[in-house]
C-alpha cells in the first residue's frame, strides 16, 4: 500500500514538473509551424536576431483582442532592434471554431499583421512552453545561437485598458537586454483566456 502511494506521489510530481513550463534562463524549445501564408516558420529562422517575442494568442479571446494593437506595436517598434514578434494560436479549433486556420488567415489579413501568425495544430508547442492563457508572452534572447527565455508573462499591467498601463513588462525587458542587463521582473502572471485544449 505504501509503495502504491509513493509511486502515485512520484508520478504526480513528475507530471507537475513536466507541466511547469519554461522559466527565465531555460533554453527555449525549437518549433516549426505553419504560418497563415502557408509557409512553415521555425524558431531557427531567427538565428540572426537578438531575440524573438513569442506571443501565444488567439482570435476570439477579449483579452487577446484588447492586446492586438499593442502586439502589432511591439513588432513595429522592436523588430528593427532585433526583437520581432511571432504569434502562435494554441487553441484546439474543434473546441474553439473561431481559431480555425481559415479564420486565423482572415483575421491576419483584416488586421494587417506585420508578423507571422502560426497554428499550433498538435498543441505540443504551447504545452512545451507552459503557456496557460492567451495572450502569454515568452521573450527569447539569442545567447550565442541558443534561444533562452529572458522574460515570461504579461505584456503590461493593464489587460483591458491600454490608457491605464503604467508598466510595460515586455518593452522594459527588451530595453534591459539591449542595455546589457537582466529583465526585472523576469516573470509576471499572464492575464487572459485559458487555452482551449482537447487533453
Descriptions of predicted regions:
Residues 44-62, 174:
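Short active-site neighborhood of thiol/selenol oxidoreductases, capturing the structured segment around
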Residues 1-23:
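Bacterial Sec-dependent N-terminal signal peptides
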Residues 58-67, 137, 193-196:
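Short, thiol/selenol-centered motifs that function as redox-active sites or metal-ligating centers
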Residues 49-52, 80-85, 112-116, 134:
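Loop/turn elements at helix/coil->beta-strand transitions in domains of secreted/extracellular proteins
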Residues 65-110, 121-128:
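Structural microenvironment flanking redox-active thiols in thiol-disulfide oxidoreductases
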Residues 139-199:
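Thiol-/selenol-based redox modules, centered on thioredoxin-like
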Residues 18-44:
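N-terminal "domain-start" segment that seeds a small globular fold
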Residues 105-146:
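Short, internal strand/loop/helix patches
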Amino acid at each position: 500500500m505504501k509503495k502504491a502511494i509513493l509511486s502515485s506521489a512520484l508520478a504526480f510530481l513528475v507530471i507537475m514538473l513536466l507541466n511547469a513550463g519554461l522559466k527565465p534562463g531555460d533554453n527555449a524549445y525549437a518549433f516549426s509551424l505553419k504560418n497563415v501564408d502557408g509557409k512553415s516558420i521555425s524558431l531557427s529562422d531567427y538565428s540572426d536576431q537578438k531575440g524573438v517575442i513569442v506571443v501565444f494568442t488567439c482570435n476570439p479571446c477579449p483579452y487577446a483582442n484588447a492586446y492586438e494593437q499593442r502586439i502589432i506595436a511591439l513588432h513595429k517598434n522592436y523588430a528593427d532592434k532585433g526583437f520581432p514578434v511571432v504569434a502562435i494560436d494554441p487553441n484546439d479549433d474543434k473546441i474553439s471554431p473561431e481559431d480555425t486556420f481559415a479564420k486565423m488567415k482572415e483575421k491576419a489579413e483584416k488586421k494587417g499583421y506585420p508578423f507571422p501568425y502560426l497554428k499550433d495544430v498538435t498543441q505540443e508547442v504551447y504545452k512545451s512552453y507552459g503557456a496557460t492563457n492567451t495572450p502569454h508572452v515568452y521573450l527569447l534572447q539569442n545567447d550565442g545561437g541558443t534561444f533562452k527565455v529572458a522574460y515570461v508573462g504579461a505584456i503590461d499591467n493593464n489587460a483591458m485598458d491600454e490608457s491605464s498601463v503604467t508598466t510595460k513588462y515586455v518593452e522594459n525587458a527588451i530595453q534591459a537586454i539591449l542595455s546589457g542587463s537582466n529583465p526585472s521582473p523576469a516573470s509576471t502572471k499572464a492575464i487572459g483566456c485559458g487555452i482551449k485544449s482537447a487533453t
